[in-house]
Amino acid sequence: MIKGVGLDLCEISRMEGKLTDERFLNRFFTSDEVSYIHSKGKCAAQTLAGLFAAKEALAKALGTGIAFDLKDVSVRHDEAGRPGYTLSGRAEQLAGGDRFHLSVSHDGGMAAAVCIREGEE
């Protein structure tokens, strides 16, 4: 059963200046995510915007707002490049064992993320 849907948009140009802001990066992203962002070269700002939007979309799908440390939500990619979440801490508690599906896209200077929360009633 679908229990929640979250959608977030993030302006890519807003994130360009954040690529070298270690305080920002370390506050909101895991070390693996920061490494992933920096590995994207010319696409680093769009990757950063997509990851940030993905975290915000999860908060909306949970229906709690940001009631957890954003580093408790790690966006990862499988072997085929599909994005997904690894939750820990308060985010994992709020999820209550539910599953989350994530889609991220970039176009027209924007990054968009959709998160669908699936679980039992």
Located regions from the model:
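Core catalytic alpha/beta fold that binds nucleotide/phospho-ligands
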Residues: 1-121
